[in-house]
Amino acid sequence: VHQQLRTLSKENAEGVAQHLVMVAALLEAEEFDAAMAHAETAVRRAGRVPAAREALGMVAYRTGDFARALGEFRTVRRISGSDHLLPLMVDSERGLGRLDRALDLAQSPEAKRLPAQDRVELAIVVSGIRRDLGQTDAALVALQIPELKRPKQPRLAYAYADTLLGLGRDEEAREWFQRAADADEDYETDAVERLEELDGIAVTDLLPGEEELAPLPPEERTGDGADRA
């Protein structure tokens, strides 16, 4: 991003950088209106800077405005020459209901040249499209990429587990949810909760700072012991 901003004046570059930092922070906090305001300001001040257009596209994507997101991602691709947003472009086509177009884009030559982590994200999106089409077997095949056998791919393992579950292959699904949970150091998924559901363990959500209380002994329960007439 710093390299991209060097095309701007020093004062403008500093201002745009601050807006981009705010976009990232506000997206993390899910304050989408404020994030959009900062992203739009960044684009007004630096419309030819890929990072600014990408920020605007990301806010649009997160808020479900897939047409606008797709337009911004295409602009980033055109002015930067990078295909790293291709998985999000495919998912935006999916969000617009254009599933055939999404699959065509996912099978493009550019998609085949994506680096490993982008291929993972694309595989997850394509699998979701296949499930949208009712093609659950094809959805599973879409996830069977080399990265599936490698560690530290919690989202890929999770998607594979969920698809296996959709096929009624519960034991295999449990194994892959466990792999996802073991790899998920950053809590990107709810694999642990899915495992507990499969194992029939009830999960109680506590508010921050609360602790689960042990049941009272019989003599201290209401209506027992000293309270009994």
Predicted regions and their residues:
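Alpha-helical segment of the N-proximal tetratricopeptide repeat
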Residues: 7-44, 55, 61
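Generic helix N-cap/helix-start motif at coil->alpha-helix transitions
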Residues: 12-19, 46-53, 80-88, 115-124, ...
